Amino acid sequence: MKNTSCLLVELHNRGGVKQPANPVKWKEFYVDDIFTISPGKRLTKADMDSGNIPFIGATDSNNGITNWIATPNSSFDRNVLGVNYNGSVVENFYHGYGCVFSDDVKRLHLKSYADNKFVLLFCKVAILQQKVKYTYGYKFNGQRMERQKILLPTDEQDSPDYTYMEQYGKWMMVQMYQYYFDYINLR
């Protein structure tokens, strides 16, 4: 791959990707203060017709996809974080594509920043850090999800530093591409 460095330069130029400085301060925020939380919708196996729309269930694998269905319902969403509150609790996945959510999965959209892959993936990790608290006997239900605190970097106004989160995500992506390109070039 002779043009790998050109591709990395293009990635840097497109998103202004640079290594973000370490945030000065981190702070706890309630999930409910950061996100709008919306429910999925119950859809039984008997009501599912085979199709090409991903159906997101409470699993810890396959990016949450448990089936492929034909018809969307009111839970159809995209560019969203799907968080399990039943089944594999606290597991969560970013869904940049259109999909339908079961009633065991909540949909999270940022309240005060435009949803984007990099910020949502940053928040995914922050939410996953809380997984150890929850078990079958102590479920991650809707109320607990709303009041769960997550640790996020802050800006000068003591608000979540979404710019830092986005830049960090982009920078990590470029680092991984560089790692892959280096591996390919060694072969």
Please provide the spans of the model-predicted regions:
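A generic structural motif
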Residues: 111-114, 154-158
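Short linear sequence motif anchored by a di-proline
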Residues: 9-10, 82, 96, 108, ...
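Non-catalytic DNA-recognition/assembly elements of restriction-modification systems
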Residues: 1-42, 46-62, 156-187
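DNA target-recognition domains and sequence-specific DNA-contacting regions of bacterial/archaeal
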Residues: 32-149
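Short leucine-rich amphipathic alpha-helical surface patches
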Residues: 127-131, 149-156, 172, 176
